[in-house]
Design a protein with these regions (language model features):
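Clamp-loader machinery-focused feature within the broader ASCE/P-loop NTPase space
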Residues: 1-127
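Conserved catalytic/switch belt of AAA+ P-loop NTPases
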Residues: 100, 130-147
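Catalytic acidic motif of RecA-like/P-loop NTPases
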Residues: 119-125, 130-137, 153
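Charged, glycine-rich active-site and insertion segments that engage polyanionic ligands
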Residues: 1-50, 68, 141-144, 150-257, ...
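Conserved adenine-binding aromatic site and its adjacent loop/helix in ATP-hydrolyzing domains
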Residues: 97, 134, 161
Length: 325
């Protein structure tokens, strides 16, 4: 994300950051929050790049500092990716040791500010958070923390209270969809990818994952079966999905993809969708679509803590068949 894109897609954050740079009042810790379609990683990296930009304002992308950062030369930057699972205590200890007072004082560096990013900070559990709270509250001089989350209600209060919270804007879905198509992804993959993240590099990576491709195949088969009958849709759930998808990542992709489809039915939004005819066909099933999307969204948020994948699919099947649980 360059300067122009940052200002275009995140105008509020751009204003806050510009004012902070001009007034030399950078927060010790930021917590960026919003929907999954927000550009969490790209915005975080842009903030980190801005902190040392020689222009004194938003990252220019032209000075030596910006060029080094964009080239991956970032000795005083660290990133923990909580999107891939729970953040472990060892991750925080490594981070704390890197930026401890003694290690900073013993290094001869030419930085203005150091920074670290923790993506999906809601994946920090209480026992892990205890290892970083003092470090977050009393950081080494010149150190800025940048945390992100798409589930702010799940971020521990002890962490939230130590951060300046800033809501990000979601990247328009049609923009992501069209960009994915331009980059060579097919319409089915682009339909589901465009609602998964606002970080385009991440979308490209997911779009090439064989497990994601298997998930899209199961989603596509379900939608085509649903167009035929509710019974065929349930059969597809219990065969194409339950038998072929494995692992929590695939399960959450499947829940999220189906939820997006049902929400499009609810609002009759198929303007750029390969499933436009299907969405229109089920315009009378809005109540059913609403119940289904609620179930699927809850399943993602709770990470299937109390029910198996087949159990969730069975509950979805009951909704489609209008059977009370």
């Amino acid at each position: 994300m360059d300067r122009d894109e940052f200002i275009k897609f995140e105008p509020r954050l751009a204003t806050i950051l510009q004012n902070a740079m001009e007034n030399k009042r950078i927060s010790q810790a930021y917590l960026l929050f919003g929907s999954p379609r927000c550009p969490f990683e790209e915005a975080s990296l842009f903030i980190a790049q801005t902190l040392n930009c020689e222009s004194g304002g938003l990252a220019c992308g032209k000075c030596d500092s910006c060029k080094r950062f964009m080239a991956g030369v970032r000795p005083d930057f660290y990133l923990i990716d909580g999107r891939i699972g729970l953040i472990k205590k060892d991750d925080i200890i490594t981070l704390r040791d890197k930026y401890s007072m003694s290690s900073v004082e013993n290094k001869k560096v030419s930085f203005q500010r150091m920074s670290y990013v923790i993506l999906q900070a809601d994946n920090i559990l209480q026992k892990v958070a205890n290892a970083m709270l003092k470090f977050l509250e009393e950081p080494a001089p010149g150190l800025t923390a940048i945390l992100t989350t798409s589930n702010i209600e799940r971020v521990l209060p002890t962490i939230r209270s130590r951060c300046e919270e800033i809501r990000l804007e979601a990247i328009p879905r049609d923009y992501l969809y069209n960009k994915l198509i331009t980059d060579g992804f097919n319409h089915e993959n682009s339909y589901f990818l465009s609602d998964m993240s606002g970080d385009f590099n991440r979308l490209e990576s997911i779009g090439q994952d064989k497990d994601f491709l298997a998930t899209v195949l199961a989603l596509d088969k379900f939608i085509k079966a649903y167009d035929k009958s509710n019974k065929e849709a349930v059969f597809s759930l219990m065969n194409d999905a339950a038998d072929r998808l494995k692992g929590s990542t695939c399960y959450n992709w499947f829940y999220g993809g189906l939820s997006r489809y049902f929400k499009d039915i609810m609002v009759q939004d198929g303007q750029f969708s390969v499933y436009k005819d299907s969405i229109v066909k089920h315009s009378c099933d809005i109540e059913k679509a609403s119940k289904a999307s609620v179930l699927l969204d809850e399943s993602v948020k709770e990470s299937n803590a109390n029910m198996s994948f087949t159990g969730i699919l069975a509950r979805l099947g009951l909704i489609l068949l209008n059977v009370k649980e």
